Amino acid sequence: MAPPRPAAAESVQARGVHLVEEPGSDTLGIVVDLSREATVRHEVLVEPNRLVIDLENTVFAGAPAQGSNRAVGPVAGWRAGLFLLGRSRIVLDLNRPVLVQRTDFVRQGPHTRLVIQLRSASQDEFAGRAQEDQKRRFASRVPDGPSVPRPAGAKPLVVLDPGHGGIDPGASGPKGEVEKEIVLAVARLIRKQLEADGRVEVQMTREDDRFISLGERVVFARNRSAALFVSLHADSLFGEADVRGASVYTLSDRASDAAAARAAEKENRADVAAGLDAPEAQREGVDDILFDLARRETRLFSQLAARGVAQSIQRSGRLHKTPLRGAGFRVLRAPDMPSILVELGYLSNPEDLQALMQEAGRQKLAQGLAAALLDFVLNNRIAISTKPLE
């Protein structure tokens, strides 16, 4: 008889992050209150300089994502939250280079306090450590799995991509409403509508509050030979509360306007905000040729899908005054998979926010989007590559 399997260890509970300056010293202490000791790993990244602290098998109690933009010593700001299932992450943006000097666990009655002491470092020392950390990450990286070809006669696949998640909350509303929760809720409603119709298969890049990198989102859809990739987002422009309405984006090597360029720049920095390496600069030459040849048909189909979605939203909701836009979003760069990004509205606009927070408003929006996605996928098919994205 096989021995009983041990029960999974209960997650460590983290209760807040505190930055403590020491008077007369250039060092800084990071204090995290825990229910018990946890495995702690840390690394640094450059461009921009950041310190990343991972807590294994740990979840932050209370608010799922926390942070502050108030500068304290060498830290310009920080954020914390769930990074991967079973791992929480603290990311500190640095205004000068520092490294971890020591890590201690201090008992405080029934609880444990994690104390991480930082020390000043030169930029050369910091960059050298970042290079070592990067080599270690690459050595342990698991390659993407092979693509899974769609069997003959299979239903076309729609991949819904709720933006942000985990440590990355996305845009926020005036009372703490967060983009990551809104787009996940709308994605679930769209999936329900599509599954009820029964003519397409639906998968989601995330189904809970976890962080997924931009590249992983594209790989997820492309390796499953998706017929359409739909990334869902919401924006926020405080100080411009009159700006409202949904927009639909397709990939463009030149932004359609300044607002589109700003939106793409913000969304493309999601990985940096979560403590990942900044994306490498695009290679020139061959990639430019491949872009022109391989993407031409896909771009046309993406634009067709975008028009259909915009028309459907116009019938069921409120469009932005410039509803069809183009910009260089990283999640739209698959060369052989029609891809669109839908900004559902503005959390900084009272009318948009009300519609996105209420079940009736979400249902109405989801019904319109589902109808448009069905119309596109069932009536416009292109040959989808099964080559995995590298």
PLM regions with names:
Residues 1-157:
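Signal-peptide-cleaved, periplasmic/extracellular N-terminal interaction regions immediately downstream
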Residues 34-36, 55-57, 94-96, 116-120, ...:
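Flexible glycine-/small-residue-rich
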Residues 40, 53, 239, 290-390:
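Active-site-adjacent mobile loop/cap segments within catalytic or ligand-binding domains
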Residues 41-43, 62-63, 167-171, 258, ...:
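Short, solvent-exposed loop/turn elements at domain surfaces
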Residues 132-286, 295-307, 315, 363, ...:
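Catalytic-core regions of hydrolytic enzymes
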